[in-house]
């Protein structure tokens, strides 16, 4: 994971990416790596988000049960309660909360898409792509979120944050270029 200082130099100015927010949206940041959590926390706070950190899936489930969360940024590979188990519980208990999963294992893409994940991003993260993905998911209509979770014809996303229209029309998961 790049440091917050390096990450800041790679992204665009906030005004170019997202409209001004009057209410701070809350992001639950779940990663067992304190360095990753700290770097992402700093970047997201600078962008105007309120960030609630969690060390693992169990802590994330406890926090989302007692807090109002707008989006979850979830590492898949964690000890104790892994990201997949955590995602399944979040999507069952809080289906309107979009989840972005992050992983160092790109082969998990197809499983993530078929599971109804809002987006999957590969480590090391490109901060500008992360910020664009967060903004897009927070602005996404509720019907799209519900359709994705129900496995209906919702746009599929992959690591670059694009939609694969050809696979959508075939009814299969998006494939990277």
Mark where each language-model region is.
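Non-catalytic signal-transmission and effector/linker regions of two-component phosphorelay proteins
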Residues: 1-26, 128-177
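Two-component/phosphorelay signaling modules centered on CheY-like receiver
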Residues: 34-52
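Acidic catalytic/metal-coordinating carboxylates
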Residues: 55-59, 82-85
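Active-site residues of response regulator receiver
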Residues: 75
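Receiver (REC) domain active-site loop signature in two-component systems and cognate sites
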Residues: 78
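Alpha4 helix (beta4-alpha4-beta5 surface) of REC/receiver domains from two-component response regulators
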Residues: 85, 105-122, 132
